Curated annotation (Swiss-Prot):
Protein name: ATP synthase subunit 9, mitochondrial
GO BP field: proton motive force-driven ATP synthesis
GO MF term (any one): lipid binding
PROSITE patterns linked to this entry: ATPASE_C
Keyword Ion transport among record annotations: yes
Organism: Acanthamoeba castellanii
Site entry: Reversibly protonated during proton transport: E63
Compartment annotation: Mitochondrion membrane
Family of the protein in this entry: Belongs to the ATPase C chain family.
Signal peptide positions on this chain: none
Pfam families: ATP-synt_C
Swiss-Prot/TrEMBL keywords: CF(0), Hydrogen ion transport, Ion transport, Lipid-binding, Membrane, Mitochondrion, Transmembrane, Transmembrane helix, Transport
Underlying gene: ATP9
PANTHER family membership: ATP SYNTHASE LIPID-BINDING PROTEIN, MITOCHONDRIAL (PTHR10031), ATPASE PROTEIN 9 (PTHR10031:SF0)
Length: 79
């Protein structure tokens, strides 16, 4: 019975570690959003306010996916 508990605990840790790989995509997505924002500012400086609001929406959606991955990792680890 003790071996089964050890296997269960180790599989929870492995699953939690794999679930956090979604955070890599969120980090890359935020970099892409703000990189494209800088390019858009340099091409059309007159639209800075409008472009910045679009970038914040993109940032929020990208971070939401990352937070969902983090929540799933904690659920796998502790439940």
């Amino acid at each position: 019975m003790k071996n089964l508990e050890i296997i269960l605990q180790s599989s929870k840790m492995i699953g939690s570690g794999l679930a956090t790989s979604g955070l890599i995509g969120a980090g890359a997505g935020v970099g892409i959003v703000f990189g494209c924002l800088i390019l858009a500012f340099s091409r059309n400086p007159n639209l800075q306010k409008e472009l910045f609001s679009y970038a914040l929406i993109g940032f929020a959606l990208t971070e939401a996916i990352g937070l969902l991955a983090l929540v799933m990792a904690f659920l796998i680890l502790f439940i």
